[in-house]
């Protein structure tokens, strides 16, 4: 697979303007990235500009804290898909996981997988807030709930992707599930290290620099 197809070209800053999003979309088309990842209010715009291409539209749910209710996340998912999203990056309820409420976490992922129908679901576990044991548990619950990917980070918390976390997550989910590294990846070397450790998708705001 060519390097560009690993990349979710990402712009999730709250101050991003329509002009910024359109630039992101044009870059994704030029460099043939896997997707653009944008906030839900920009999904329609992204869909309209990418529907005749093979670049997917990715958006976020329960972002960035993961602390909204399951019902809220399900509704967000349904609206995003109606607006044209192909991929959903959802944030788990980190506090519920850390409280040992495994069934809650599994249920919310399962509900979002169901709401997404045949669309891709990536589960953001926010590795920087978890112990090693919790990281493995989050990955296991994601797999059991039927998600397609586990993802390291929102990029809005205390840390981003680390190679050792990618390796741990890959070992936890096995070969038949995607692993997305996101947060703090700024160079091609960093991206290649993530891929070597098991990442099958890279979330980055500097996608153009990574493939030039």
Swiss-Prot record:
- Name the pathway: Carbohydrate degradation; 2-deoxy-D-ribose 1-phosphate degradation; D-glyceraldehyde 3-phosphate and acetaldehyde from 2-deoxy-alpha-D-ribose 1-phosphate: step 2/2
Keyword terms of this UniProt record: Cytoplasm, Lyase, Schiff base
Q: What class of enzyme is it?
A: lyase
Any Gene Ontology biological process: deoxyribonucleotide catabolic process
Q: Name one GO molecular function term.
A: deoxyribose-phosphate aldolase activity
Query: What is a single cellular component term in the Gene Ontology annotation?
Result: cytoplasm
Q: EC number(s) in its UniProt entry?
A: 4.1.2.4
What is known about what this protein does?
Answer: Catalyzes a reversible aldol reaction between acetaldehyde and D-glyceraldehyde 3-phosphate to generate 2-deoxy-D-ribose 5-phosphate.
The family annotation for this protein states:
Belongs to the DeoC/FbaB aldolase family. DeoC type 1 subfamily.
Protein name, UniProt field: Deoxyribose-phosphate aldolase
Organism classification: Bacteria, Bacillati, Bacillota, Clostridia, Eubacteriales
């Amino acid at each position: 697979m060519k390097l560009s197809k690993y990349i979710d070209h990402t712009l999730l800053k709250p101050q991003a303007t329509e002009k910024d999003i359109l630039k992101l979309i044009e870059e994704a088309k030029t460099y043939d990235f896997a997707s653009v990842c944008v906030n839900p209010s920009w999904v329609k715009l992204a869909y309209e500009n990418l529907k005749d291409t093979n670049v997917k539209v990715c958006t976020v749910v329960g972002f960035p804290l993961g602390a909204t209710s399951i019902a809220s996340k399900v509704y967000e998912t349904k609206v995003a898909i109606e607006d044209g999203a192909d991929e959903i990056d959802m944030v788990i309820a980190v506090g519920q996981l850390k409280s040992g409420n495994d069934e809650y976490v599994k249920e919310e992922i399962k509900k979002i997988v169901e709401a997404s129908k045949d669309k891709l679901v990536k589960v953001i576990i926010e590795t920087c807030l978890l112990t090693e044991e919790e990281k493995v548990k989050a990955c296991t619950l994601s797999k059991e709930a039927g998600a397609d990917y586990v993802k390291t980070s929102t990029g809005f918390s205390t840390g981003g992707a680390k190679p050792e976390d990618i390796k741990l997550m890959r070992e936890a989910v096995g070969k038949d599930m995607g692993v997305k590294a996101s947060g703090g990846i700024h160079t091609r070397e960093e991206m290649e290290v993530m891929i070597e450790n098991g990442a099958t998708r890279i979330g980055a705001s500097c996608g153009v620099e990574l493939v030039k």
